[in-house]
């Protein structure tokens, strides 16, 4: 009986410890930014207050769980992309998207700076239609500023974490 009581106390204590972590995850949103080489985008987004995580990876390609060599070959269709998880009560999707637009050249295709190739194509990939509406509205404003606009705005098809380096 004592073992059962001790076990019950342990279960209750563990559930109380885990509850804040679970509730913190609730309300988080995710957006995916492709802005050339993912390391710079990841670093920039990770510094934003309200961003809980920025993870480099590969989005919207045709191969499951690709590695860098496959992606850089141009044969997989993936874009170097950063998955940004954020708290919308601290930073908005509009603010993140405006920061993204300020950090890229939206007028070129398959290139950012010295990085050239289809894996460096700029894009914003969303996982819910409400986010897509916000992004398309901001993209329309951005298009008015430039003679060309080459940023992909699409639903997210898939995302694979990049290898650790």
List each model region and its residues:
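Flexible coil/turn and secondary-structure edge motifs
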Residues: 16-165
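Bacterial N-terminal signal peptides
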Residues: 7-18
């Amino acid at each position: 009986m004592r073992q059962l009581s001790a076990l019950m106390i342990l279960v209750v204590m563990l559930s109380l410890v885990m509850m804040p972590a679970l509730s913190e995850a609730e309300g988080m949103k995710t957006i995916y930014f492709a802005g050339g080489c993912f390391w710079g985008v990841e670093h920039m987004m990770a510094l934003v207050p309200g961003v809980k995580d920025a993870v480099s990876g590969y989005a919207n390609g045709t191969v499951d769980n690709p590695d860098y060599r496959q992606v850089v070959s141009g044969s997989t269709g993936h874009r170097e992309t950063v998955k940004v998880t954020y708290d919308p009560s601290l930073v908005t999707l509009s603010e993140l998207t405006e920061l993204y637009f300020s950090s890229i050249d939206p007028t070129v295709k398959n290139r950012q700076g010295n990085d050239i190739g289809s894996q460096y194509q700029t894009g914003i990939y969303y996982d819910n239609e409400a986010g897509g509406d916000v992004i398309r509205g901001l993209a329309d404003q951005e298009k008015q500023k430039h003679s060309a606009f080459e940023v992909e705005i699409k639903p997210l098809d898939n995302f694979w974490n990049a290898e650790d380096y």
